[in-house]
């Protein structure tokens, strides 16, 4: 069955905010100070937990969320900041936004945390994001490599055994679908899980797309244990062993999370 924090959204929001404050922001600040008044956009802001950590640092924030229910929850999470004019939450597709009409300023920093692996045309979104950034602007990406033990997000499945079984998302689609059906997963759950199988991204593919769309990698960290596991499972975050980070393709299978900071090239 899904873990309790997948169902209790208040716990989930607190975990996301704490993780952003303790790990995500310090990672970014190795190269880019987070200062008051900085313009920050989060794409796929969910219920607003990550963006809240940046607002607490004095940033001006915009949250973009495609799902109406999550956008409404984000507005509740950030109601004080929205009321003061420090933040807005938009229930829109990123491709439907008119940068010049919708915003008074371009952005210093864009955040995509656990989002890029859900987007179908990752090449197109990277190209599109250049339009939102100031010259020399930055993007943070955090994502699980597709081949990692739970890269198929199977931990959210209803069946207890499936939610705890690593790597079975790598099976061929017909067999994968058959197992999900045999263990009683709902049609919606199966559809969502198969969609992730279509959009999962590897370290190598991500870096090729970054270069193709004229971004430079400023920072990268390979995590053996994802920082969010501290809050979900009481596991101490650990960076990946240096030797394993240098083995292309294999590193995807043993790295649970990647953090990147990339910069827009001229």
Where are these predicted regions, by residue range?
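A structural helix-start
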Residues: 71, 119-120
């Amino acid at each position: 069955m899904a873990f309790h924090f997948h169902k209790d959204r208040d716990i989930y929001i607190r975990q996301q905010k704490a993780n952003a404050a303790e790990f995500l922001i310090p990672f970014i600040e190795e190269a880019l100070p987070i200062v008051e008044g900085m313009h920050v956009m989060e794409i796929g802001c969910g219920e607003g937990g990550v963006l809240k950590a940046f607002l607490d640092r004095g940033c001006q924030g915009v949250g973009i969320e495609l799902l109406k229910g999550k956008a409404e929850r984000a507005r509740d999470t950030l109601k004080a900041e929205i009321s003061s004019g420090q933040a807005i939450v938009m229930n829109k597709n990123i491709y439907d936004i008119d940068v010049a009409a919708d915003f008074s300023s371009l952005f210093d920093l864009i955040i995509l945390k656990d989002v890029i692996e859900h987007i179908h045309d990752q090449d197109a979104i990277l190209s599109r994001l250049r339009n939102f950034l100031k010259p020399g602007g930055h993007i943070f990406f955090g994502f699980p490599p597709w081949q990692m033990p739970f890269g198929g997000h199977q931990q959210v499945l209803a069946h207890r055994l499936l939610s705890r079984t690593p790597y079975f998302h790598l099976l061929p689609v017909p067999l994968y679908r058959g197992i999900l059906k045999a263990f009683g997963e709902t049609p919606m759950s199966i559809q969502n899980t198969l969609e992730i199988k279509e959009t999962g991204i590897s370290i190598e593919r991500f870096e090729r797309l970054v270069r193709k769309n004229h971004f430079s990698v400023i920072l990268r960290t390979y995590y053996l244990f994802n920082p969010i596991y501290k809050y979900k499972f009481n596991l101490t975050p650990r960076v990946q062993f240096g030797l394993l980070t240098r083995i292309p393709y294999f590193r995807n299978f043993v790295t649970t999370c990647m953090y990147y900071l990339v910069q827009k090239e001229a």
